[in-house]
UniProtKB/Swiss-Prot annotation:
Location of the protein in the cell: Cytoplasm
TM region positions: none
Name of this protein: Leucyl/phenylalanyl-tRNA--protein transferase
GO molecular function: leucyl-tRNA--protein transferase activity
Signal peptide span: none
Superkingdom, taxonomy of origin: Bacteria
Family: Belongs to the L/F-transferase family.
SUPFAM superfamilies: Acyl-CoA N-acyltransferases (Nat)
Task of the protein: Functions in the N-end rule pathway of protein degradation where it conjugates Leu, Phe and, less efficiently, Met from aminoacyl-tRNAs to the N-termini of proteins containing an N-terminal arginine or lysine.
Residues covered by region (Disordered): 1-21
Keywords: Acyltransferase, Cytoplasm, Transferase
EC code: 2.3.2.6
Length: 249
């Protein structure tokens, strides 16, 4: 008999999640309810292919949808027209220099079909805590001193779990995603988790993986050692125009 109710989590952040395969079919991927956003619980969730997603006024909801939406780090779609525009782009790229601003901008960005934001104050505080602990990271796009795009997520081992991205100017989020993918591909990280499919992600080259395949991939990648050094030091400051010549498809 298939499960019809999500698992209720205990108040202990060290308590395990149920297997992701126990997630409901309707709504797709809902696995558990309750608990908290303690860093130990969050890291345990991501390491097992689970993520939190809820709105203000809802209890904490934990998901592992099937299929899972991912980006191959060598397969971000940048159109020929966009690449031509990139060649003369004067924007610069950095990592982990404006994490708080990126997550705040993502929270304020309107989403088609969504009223309000799921990046609540509670969520922002939780990911700022993960950032301070060295697990949550951002790639940022600047026009001079102005932040015009960015993406943030969680890295465990050699797996990046994307959370959200934003554009403060046309193309900002696309450049941030391409910059992240190019960096991770260079490090040998094959996938970026994109969680749930939407038309925008699919136009950028996102693909679907069956949950079983995704979980196997996550188990392998999170067990690998992350490269030494901070993201800011490794990344430095780069020119967005360099992405025009990077073959990601």
């Amino acid at each position: 008999m298939s499960r019809t109710l999500p698992h209720l989590l205990s108040s202990d952040p060290a308590s395990p999640f149920p297997p992701a395969e126990h997630a409901l079919r309707e709504p797709d991927g809902l696995l558990a309810i309750g608990g908290d956003l303690h860093p130990q619980r969050l890291l345990n969730a991501y390491a097992h292919g689970i993520f939190p997603w809820f709105s203000d006024g809802q209890p904490l909801l934990w998901w592992s949808p099937n299929p899972r939406t991912v980006f191959r780090t060598d397969a971000i779609h940048l159109s020929s027209r966009f690449r031509r525009q990139l060649r003369t782009c004067t924007w610069t790229l950095r990592a982990d220099t404006a994490f708080a601003q990126v997550i705040a901008a993502c929270a304020l960005s309107p989403r088609p079909g969504q009223d309000g934001t799921w990046i609540t104050d509670q969520m922002q505080e939780a990911y700022l805590d993960l950032h301070r602990r060295g697990y949550a990271h951002s790639v940022e796009v600047f026009d001079g001193a102005r932040l015009v795009g960015g993406i943030y997520g969680v890295a465990i081992g050699q797996m990046f779990f994307g959370e959200s991205m934003f554009s403060g100017a046309s193309g900002g989020s696309k450049i941030a995603l391409a910059a992240l993918a190019a960096e991770l591909h260079g490090l040998g990280w094959p996938l970026i988790d994109a969680q749930v499919e939407n038309p925008h992600l699919m136009r950028l080259g996102a693909q679907r993986l069956q949950r079983e395949q995704f979980l196997q991939h996550v188990a392998t990648q999170v067990a690998l050692p992350e490269p030494p050094g901070s993201w800011t030091q490794r990344y430095g400051e780069r020119h967005a125009s360099a992405l025009a010549g990077v073959r990601l498809t």
